[in-house]
């Protein structure tokens, strides 16, 4: 055979044979199987070559036909290195093998470079007889020790069924050559004389074909990671608002809503209160793209190279005062999310969308935000068997609580926080490209994230910060079955997250922000996000501030003249106070912080 030649022997070969009176063969025919390239010529031996003198020489003998068979020759001689590919039935401890009545003088080795596994083993270690004493010293398996044999790069080093992965070694014993098989989570070492040492790898997922693990990996590194990213980024209102010093937040919340009413004391201007004026309320919109690049060494699973990416677009209602000193705002958001994973020859991709809402509460330096979101994902896995397609539904709820400790009038803020979240992921059952039925129990995951942020407010509006978080995942084991075989329950190990970010405000209506966080531990890599926020709507008519003058002080207080429609009238009981500027509101807030919201006439005169 030459020039990538292939020969298919679909029928038996039975030549002329002479025998003596005792039935022994005295003369027979010869079959010489020879190629010009061991890796690029193939002889498909799908039937018997009976009673022949056979030689193998510089080619590949392929006996794969999904059934095991014992080939028997009169004589066999390996003239030069020859590859051999065989069917293996682990359940019955049988494989394709070659026997002969006699063996010639071998000048090469029979390299077993590939195996087609027909069934799974029922034992921890399965041994199968392969070579007779006349051949056993010239057999080399496809996974030698490094540098021991010069095997072609295409030699198969691990062996697969649709569910399991196997390691195999060749054990050359006195009575013949044996192949030893064990699942991939065990390393076999022959100790001679039929003895063998079994060493566990420590990772139960090593026992399985990577193609069968793709559903568990997609649930953890795809959907679960996507929901956790959403929880990190959906608290945009509190992230932006609570980076601002307290006095500036007071000025924002009480913008155009001051009123004064005297108490009757000439030295006391009166009680400070807020008036609702819908025309002066503004909403805001924000957009936040994100991406992460990482590897995830899953507990009880493979090490996964993972990329997540997406964009959230949100809308915040105005901050409104409610009861007992609390303020609140609502946020609605939608998002696109995607992820891709790569591990052990498997490529997975997920794409989907989500929708959610957040309620954020503020009181002084305290904030509490709760978000609820739900979405769907369609995904595909590209494996050695083909492409799997599946659909996932996900939902979750998260709550983040934090408090600001301010120093130097808000120039420095230390903000400890706690994020708690619950994630639900359901992957619908499907049949993969190998014909295995994949059944998925819903994933229930709880995440606990204590963290702290150190924020600096500069004079020019820049707000750089440093953040540190510790992430624990609880009850997040994925539960998946393949043809009723329970697969390892995988989860993401705890990890630490730290990094830097910055915000910048422009003209009181715009804000830009960016962040880079490094992750170490159960996730290793970097998460990046950036975005832009802008206020929408326009200011209404400025609100006038009215003070009623009581009789006690009317004799010393000049009456104010008010012109309306070009007419002059005198209002003996009222006077008009101009709207306060933003700078005046901040200065006034400094005197009102944590007070009963009363002030003196002297304070107002200073303003």
Which functions belong to the PLM regions below?
Residues 279, 319-324, 361-365, 405-409, ...:
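Outer-membrane beta-barrel strand-turn architecture
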Residues 437-561, 565:
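Outer membrane beta-barrel transmembrane domains
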Residues 180-181, 185-188, 192-196, 475-478, ...:
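Flexible, glycine-rich linker and terminal segments associated
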Residues 281-285, 324-330, 364-370, 408-416, ...:
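Outer-envelope beta-barrel architecture signal
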Residues 2-137:
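Extracellular beta-strand/loop-rich repeat segments of large surface/secreted proteins
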Residues 311-317, 355-361, 372-374, 397-405, ...:
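Residues on the lipid-exposed face of transmembrane beta-strands in outer-membrane beta-barrel proteins
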Residues 304, 339-349, 372, 377-395, ...:
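Extracellular/periplasm-exposed beta-strand and loop segments of Gram-negative cell-envelope proteins
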Residues 212-409, 515-517, 522, 591, ...:
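Outer membrane beta-barrel translocator domains of Type V secretion systems
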């Amino acid at each position: 055979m030459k020039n990538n030649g292939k020969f298919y022997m679909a029928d038996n070969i039975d030549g002329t044979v002479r025998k003596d009176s005792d039935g022994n063969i005295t003369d027979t025919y010869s079959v010489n199987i020879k190629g010009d390239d061991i890796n690029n010529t193939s002889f498909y031996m799908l039937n018997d070559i009976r009673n022949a003198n056979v030689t193998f020489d510089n080619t590949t003998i392929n006996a794969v036909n999904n059934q095991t068979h014992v080939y028997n020759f009169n004589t066999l001689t390996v003239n030069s290195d020859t590859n051999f590919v065989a069917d293996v039935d682990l359940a019955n401890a049988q494989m394709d093998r070659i026997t002969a009545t006699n063996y010639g003088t071998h000048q090469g080795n029979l390299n077993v470079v590939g195996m087609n596994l027909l069934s799974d083993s029922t034992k921890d270690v399965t041994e199968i007889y392969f070579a007779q004493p006349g051949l056993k010293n010239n057999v080399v398996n496809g996974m030698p020790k490094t540098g021991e044999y010069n095997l072609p790069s295409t030699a198969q080093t691990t062996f697969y069924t649709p569910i399991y992965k196997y390691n195999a070694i060749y054990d050359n014993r006195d009575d013949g050559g044996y192949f030893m098989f064990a699942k991939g989570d065990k390393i076999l070492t022959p100790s001679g004389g039929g003895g063998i040492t079994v060493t566990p790898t420590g990772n139960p997922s090593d026992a399985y074909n990577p193609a069968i693990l793709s559903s568990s990996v997609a649930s953890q590194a795809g959907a679960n990671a996507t929901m956790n990213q959403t929880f990190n980024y959906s608290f945009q209102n509190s992230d932006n608002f609570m980076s601002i010093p307290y006095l500036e937040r007071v000025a924002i919340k009480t913008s155009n809503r001051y009123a004064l009413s005297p108490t009757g004391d000439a030295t006391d201007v009166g009680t400070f209160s807020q008036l609702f004026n819908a025309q002066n309320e503004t909403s805001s919109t924000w957009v936040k793209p994100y991406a992460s690049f990482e590897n995830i060494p899953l507990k009880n699973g493979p090490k996964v190279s993972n990329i997540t990416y997406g964009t959230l677009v949100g809308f915040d209602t105005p901050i409104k005062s409610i009861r007992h000193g609390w303020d609140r705002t609502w946020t609605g958001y939608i998002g696109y999310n995607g992820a891709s994973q790569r591990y052990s020859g498997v490529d997975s991709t997920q794409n989907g969308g989500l929708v959610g809402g957040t309620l954020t509460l503020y009181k002084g330096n305290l904030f509490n935000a709760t978000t609820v979101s739900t979405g769907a994902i369609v995904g595909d896995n590209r494996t050695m068997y083909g492409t799997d397609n599946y659909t996932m539904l996900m939902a979750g709820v998260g709550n983040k609580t934090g408090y600001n400790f301010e120093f130097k009038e808000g120039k420095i803020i230390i903000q400890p926080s706690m994020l708690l979240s619950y994630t639900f992921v359901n992957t619908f059952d499907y049949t993969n490209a190998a014909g295995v039925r994949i059944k998925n129990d819903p994933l229930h995951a709880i995440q606990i994230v204590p963290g702290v942020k150190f924020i600096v407010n500069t004079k020019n509006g820049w707000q750089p910060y440093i953040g540190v978080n510790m992430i624990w995942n609880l009850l997040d084991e994925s539960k998946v079955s393949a043809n009723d075989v329970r697969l390892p329950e995988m989860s993401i190990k705890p990890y630490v997250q730290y990094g830097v970010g910055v915000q910048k405000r422009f003209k009181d209506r715009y804000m830009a922000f960016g962040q880079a966080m490094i992750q170490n531990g159960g996730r290793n890599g970097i998460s990046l996000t950036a975005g832009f926020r802008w206020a929408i709507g326009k200011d209404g008519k400025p609100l006038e501030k009215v003070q009623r003058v009581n009789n006690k002080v009317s004799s010393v207080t000049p009456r104010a003249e008010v012109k309306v429609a070009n007419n002059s009238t005198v209002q003996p009981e009222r006077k008009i106070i101009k709207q306060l500027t933003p700078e005046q509101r901040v200065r006034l807030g400094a005197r009102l912080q944590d007070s009963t919201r009363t002030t003196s006439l002297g304070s107002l005169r200073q303003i």
